[in-house]
Amino acid sequence: GVVVVKGMKPAAQIPQEDVDAIAALLDRANIDAERHLTSDTISENAPVKAWREAYRLFKTKKGARCSIENLLKRVLKGKPVAHITPAVDIYNTVSLTYALPVGGEDIDAMASDIRLGITEGGDAFRPLGEDEDAPTLEGELCYRDDAGAICRCWNWRDGERTALTDASQKAFLIIESVDPARADDLAAATDQLAAMVQQYL
């Protein structure tokens, strides 16, 4: 599911009551996510298992995991997903609620249309929060544009260049599922994401 957002408010212009409401929804989602965790072994939980199987089908950086696994692992360890920015908190809320990976990129920072595909390797990429480049691997599945990679290993690691910031005005938000049986969950998650963005951003 894809949600394209235009005319986003700068974070500083979002009323404090809305910031607090979003934070409360994320807190609730951290609790709700526990229903997706039927095993203390992270890889044995159905949402994680489905993505682990998908990740075996393409070349990945060692240790790369789907973003929803990283979020659910925090919940499993009793370390709730923290508040970051209103926009990121919204998509993390939806991600935790439905146990589906949700990502977001700044459209204005993209060099061209975004595309998902197998790369020949060497695509420029600076991981979010890192000081050194980490180019893509040959045979890796990634999101990219004409300037390089946007998200490594499908939905594992976002890049600095197109990351959403407090000043972002246009956003590309995406929710993904590899389980056909969860089509209704994907549709519901997309609807909730669109509704929250429209209400708060």
How should these model regions be labeled?
Residues 1-201:
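Charge-biased, low-complexity intrinsically disordered regions
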